[in-house]
Design a protein with these regions (language model features):
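Ligand-binding pocket segment of bilobal, Venus flytrap-like solute-binding proteins
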Residues: 157-231
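Extracytoplasmic "Venus flytrap"
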Residues: 29-47, 62-68, 168-171
Length: 300
């Protein structure tokens, strides 16, 4: 009987150690996701380096599309990534009513909490969509706003104009389709050229196209001295860059929310645009730009 009791005690102790070890491992390991363009690659790299420096076991998985990444997080394959409030609200939750930046954040935060995704503090970086033209060309045509552009496209002078768009913008609920609906315009297929996100800036700069969609915080907008058209009907929602984390990951890592909020507080339009430009204009590596930023801010 004593041998049985001793054996049971030993088994219980081993099991307890295994459970504690497994819990510690789960609590310390995080999968950081990201999309496939510069800003997202910077943020996933920066977050992975930052968390690794804090002692977490980090697995970085980026280069995904928006829908694939969202699905991976919902399925528990990704613990956290940086999403945009407008994308979360319109694309994932199908809310199309016009809301203020604050209400956009509060609404998507409340909706996603129901599916176990927690939106932490939003940054001041608003990577909204925009339309841009070469500054001299826009001035020549007297175009200042999207309405001016739409009017020009219907004229004899502008009927053959070419617009560049990446594939995602042309397909998204909050992209080209809703833009054209908001401005009551039908764009013939011959006027639209779909291409990789990185090529739209070159296409406009090299006069291959006359108009292009851009991301507001992309460093190439300033580098190429493009003119960003006024969204005079306030169509595009706010796209505040925000860390979104699985509720289970936050529960397993009590300090994680505060740690990510520190990083979020450092991001604004100017900072994000500058970081993007270091990669896309100056040719520095994603890892180097991310590490330098962390070091400069005492986070690494």
């Amino acid at each position: 009987m004593k041998r049985v009791t001793s054996l049971l005690a030993t088994v219980a102790m081993v099991f307890s150690v295994m459970v504690c070890s497994a819990s510690a491992q789960a609590a310390g390991k995080l999968v950081v996701g990201g999309k496939g363009y510069t800003e997202q690659l910077i943020m996933s790299s920066m977050t992975a380096q930052y968390l690794a420096g804090l002692g977490y076991d980090v697995d970085q998985r980026d280069g995904m599309g928006s829908t694939v990444l969202r699905t991976a997080q919902l399925n528990g394959q990704v613990d956290l990534y940086w999403e945009y409030t407008g994308t979360g609200l319109v694309t994932f939750n199908k809310v199309v009513e016009k809301l203020s930046p604050e209400d956009t954040y509060l609404r998507v935060k409340a909706l996603d909490e129901k599916v176990g995704l927690i939106w932490l503090d939003p940054s001041q970086a608003n990577n909204t969509y925009a339309l841009a033209m070469r500054k001299d060309f826009a001035k020549e045509k007297g175009i200042e706003s999207i309405s001016d552009m739409m009017e020009w496209l219907q004229s004899e002078d502008g009927k053959d104009a070419q617009m560049a768009s990446n594939v995602e913008f042309s397909a998204r609920q909050d992209g080209l389709k809703s833009l054209l609906e908001a401005y009551e315009f039908e764009m013939p297929r011959r006027n639209l050229r779909k291409m990789n996100s990185g090529l739209v800036y070159q296409a406009l700069s090299q006069e291959v196209v006359d108009i292009t969609m851009v991301f507001a915080t992309d460093g190439r907008v300033k580098a190429f001295d493009f003119y960003v058209l006024k969204d005079d009907r306030n169509h595009f929602p706010n796209y505040a860059l925000t860390p979104v984390v699985r509720q289970d990951a936050l529960a397993a890592n009590p300090e994680l929310a505060a740690q990510l909020n520190v990083l979020s507080a450092l991001m604004n339009d100017t900072t994000m645009s500058s970081l993007n430009a270091l990669v896309d204009v100056d040719g520095l590596s994603i890892e180097r730009v991310s590490r330098q930023f962390l070091e400069q801010n005492g986070l690494l």
